[in-house]
Amino acid sequence: MMKVLVVVALLVTLISYSSSEGIDDLEADELLSLMANEQTRAKACTPRFYDCSHDRHSCCRSELFKDVCTCFYPEGGDNEVCTCQQPKHLKYMEKAAGKAKKFGGKIKKWFG
């Protein structure tokens, strides 16, 4: 078991080292130009409950998570309908994160 942990730690170290070298090789100008290209490539996202059948990866983000394009067949219909929706488990996680953030603010007031 100890050998497995040592091998895993070694692999993680090697991967992080190799990825940091790749970033260091980029010059600042190249990095800025890459970021500028990424911003111009971005397109408008599809709001929640709107049709996303044209591009299933275009759904907007909520506070923490990206909405998912969900497709279904309405009752008695033959046409597939796709809309951007937030899965319930992510909705509950966002609510919990909001409550934790609010509670953290109260604790900060009490002891801050």
UniProtKB/Swiss-Prot annotation:
Q: Which InterPro entries match?
A: Spider_toxin_CSTX_knottin, Spider_toxin_CSTX_Knottin_CS
The compartments listed are: Secreted
Q: List, alphabetically, the Pfam families matched.
A: Toxin_35 (PF10530)
Known tissue expression: Expressed by the venom gland.
Q: Name one GO molecular function term.
A: toxin activity
Q: Which residues form the propeptide?
A: 21-41
**Its domain of life?**
Eukaryota
Keyword annotations for this protein? Disulfide bond, Knottin, Secreted, Signal, Toxin
Q: What is its main location?
A: secreted
- What does the record's free text say on domains? The presence of a 'disulfide through disulfide knot' structurally defines this protein as a knottin.
What family does the database annotate? Belongs to the neurotoxin 19 (CSTX) family. 01 subfamily.
Q: What is this protein called?
A: Toxin-like structure LSTX-D10
- Give the organism, scientific name: Lycosa singoriensis
